[in-house]
Each structure stands twice: as structure tokens, then as C-alpha cells.
Amino acid sequence: MFSTSAKIVKPNGEKPDEFESGISQALLELEMNSDLKAQLRELNITAAKEIEVGGSRKAIIIFVPVPQLKSFQKIQVRLVRELEKKFSGKHVVFIAQRRILPKPTRKSRSKNKQKRPRSRTLTSVHDAILEDLVFPSEIVGKRIRVKMDSSRLIKVHLDKAQQNNVEHKVETFSGVYKKLTGKDVVFEFPEFQL
């Protein structure tokens, strides 16, 4: 039998905590029993967190390595359904584990000879987190509303076709995004007239 940490690979060889081991164990059980076996065998996760969203609800964020994100997304709808059954209805979201490199300043410029890639900038990482969050729905538009006190509210327009699948999770998405990035976001399903 595999150990509970078989499905979790932490960066820098850290030990997974109890909650992460539980998620890893659940993924292992799914791999053993379900017809997702072939797809799940190659995949692992890097971290997992449980956060509170909107009062009493809890959500589980599972971080996966960026190269494996596409493979996870192929089976994500079924995987999420199975995991939500296991964890008694807590919403589960998959997000790729990305790194943000600091903006080069005059002082720090000499240290890093390489130019910072666009994919490691804060803006790019935050946008990518948003896209991972709402999968399988797609973002079709975005509006940023700056209020008089200069606080920002991001309105994200999601694909109307997926409204039935993701509408009940919209509050969770907002809570998770606020927790990870500190930004307020509202999701809408606009009717587009051509």
C-alpha cells in the first residue's frame, strides 16, 4: 500500500501537514477505486489549504504543479465531484502553484541578470489564478471599477453557457480569490446582445 504522502510533492522537501495528507489520501483512494486511475496515476499536488468563505462555508484549495494543470483540467469536473462527496459538500478548487518574482528595482537589478518573464509578474499570476478558479467556465470579459476612495472592485463576466454548473460556487470563488490575492471580485453572467 502507498503511503499517504504519495500524491503530494512539497517544494524544498517539506513534510505535508495533516490536512494535506488527508487530501493526498483521498486522491489515492480515488486512484485505486475509480475509473480515473489511468489519468490520476501520473499526477500529484504541491499543497492544499482549507479556508472559510462567506460565513460558515469552507472551501478546499488544492495547488497543483503548473505543467500538470492541463492534465488535471481534463478530469477536473469528475474529480471535483468525487472530492466534494468525500469532504461532505465543501467546495473544491484546483489552482496551479505559481511564483511571483519581485519587480526589479534600481538596487536589485544587478543581482538578477535574467529579465523577469511576464508569466512571473504579479498581474499575470493573479489573472491566471482567476482563470484556474472558474474552470470549466471561461472568462469572457472584465471590468475594473475604481471607487471614490480608490478601492477597486473587479467585475468578471463568465460564460453564460456554464451558468448552471458554476453559479452556486460564485461566492466561493470570490472568497478564495480575496484570500489568495487580497482583491475584491464579483462574478456576473451577462446577457450579450449583438
From Swiss-Prot:
<dbReference type="InterPro" id="IPR047861">
    <property type="entry name" value="Ribosomal_eS7_CS"/>
</dbReference>
<keyword id="KW-0539">Nucleus</keyword>
<protein>
    <recommendedName>
        <fullName>Small ribosomal subunit protein eS7</fullName>
    </recommendedName>
</protein>
<keyword id="KW-0689">Ribosomal protein</keyword>
<comment type="function">
    <text>Component of the small ribosomal subunit. The ribosome is a large ribonucleoprotein complex responsible for the synthesis of proteins in the cell. Required for rRNA maturation.</text>
</comment>
<dbReference type="GO" id="GO:0005634">
    <property type="term" value="C:nucleus"/>
</dbReference>
<dbReference type="GO" id="GO:0005813">
    <property type="term" value="C:centrosome"/>
</dbReference>
<dbReference type="GO" id="GO:0003735">
    <property type="term" value="F:structural constituent of ribosome"/>
</dbReference>
<keyword id="KW-0687">Ribonucleoprotein</keyword>
<comment type="subunit">
    <text>Component of the small ribosomal subunit.</text>
</comment>
<keyword id="KW-0963">Cytoplasm</keyword>
<dbReference type="GO" id="GO:0006412">
    <property type="term" value="P:translation"/>
</dbReference>
<dbReference type="GO" id="GO:0022627">
    <property type="term" value="C:cytosolic small ribosomal subunit"/>
</dbReference>
<dbReference type="GO" id="GO:0030686">
    <property type="term" value="C:90S preribosome"/>
</dbReference>
<comment type="similarity">
    <text>Belongs to the eukaryotic ribosomal protein eS7 family.</text>
</comment>
<dbReference type="GO" id="GO:0006364">
    <property type="term" value="P:rRNA processing"/>
</dbReference>
<dbReference type="InterPro" id="IPR000554">
    <property type="entry name" value="Ribosomal_eS7"/>
</dbReference>
<dbReference type="GO" id="GO:0042274">
    <property type="term" value="P:ribosomal small subunit biogenesis"/>
</dbReference>
<dbReference type="Pfam" id="PF01251">
    <property type="entry name" value="Ribosomal_S7e"/>
</dbReference>
<keyword id="KW-0206">Cytoskeleton</keyword>
<dbReference type="GO" id="GO:0032040">
    <property type="term" value="C:small-subunit processome"/>
</dbReference>
